[in-house]
């Protein structure tokens, strides 16, 4: 008897050659980080964006605080019931809302 079935062994596929990263070019850190670093200005460019943050805030605070008074305590009632982010809504009277009893619900007859 001779076996005429198809072979179950398959030759491995040839792998495609991929150049390693050092051959392609240098890896940039912004490709892999979530934070975006500000671009540093070159020597010939003036640094117009760089200012002392404390000096900038002082100028803003002087104009903003002149027309505003003390803030009212609007959150005093909310502090008694901290929300956890998983709060469920209760009914208008504070009791839990249960689904209606199917025996009590009247169905409209056709």
UniProtKB/Swiss-Prot annotation:
It comes from the Eukaryota. Residues 32-45, 87-96 have a biased composition (Acidic residues). Residues 1-110 are annotated as: Disordered. InterPro entries: GAGE, GAGE_fam. Pfam families: GAGE. This gene belongs to a multigene family expressed in a large variety of tumors whereas in normal tissues, expression is restricted to germ cells. These genes organized in clustered repeats, have a high degree of predicted sequence identity, but differ by scattered single nucleotide substitution. Their sequences contain either the antigenic peptide YYWPRPRRY or YRPRPRRY which is recognized by cytotoxic T-cells. Belongs to the GAGE family. This is G antigen 2E. It comes from Homo sapiens. The lineage of its organism: Eukaryota, Metazoa, Chordata, Craniata, Vertebrata. The gene is GAGE2E.
């Amino acid at each position: 008897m001779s076996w005429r079935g198809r072979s179950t062994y398959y030759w491995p596929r040839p792998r495609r050659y991929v150049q390693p990263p050092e051959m392609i070019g240098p890896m940039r850190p912004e490709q892999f980080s979530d934070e975006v670093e500000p671009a540093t200005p070159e020597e010939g460019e003036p640094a117009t964006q760089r200012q002392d943050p404390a000096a900038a805030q002082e100028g803003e605070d002087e104009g903003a605080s002149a027309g505003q008074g003390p803030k009212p305590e609007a959150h005093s009632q909310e502090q008694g019931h901290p929300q956890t982010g998983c709060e469920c809504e209760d009914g208008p009277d504070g009791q839990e809302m249960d689904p209606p009893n199917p025996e009590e619900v009247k169905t409209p007859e056709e």
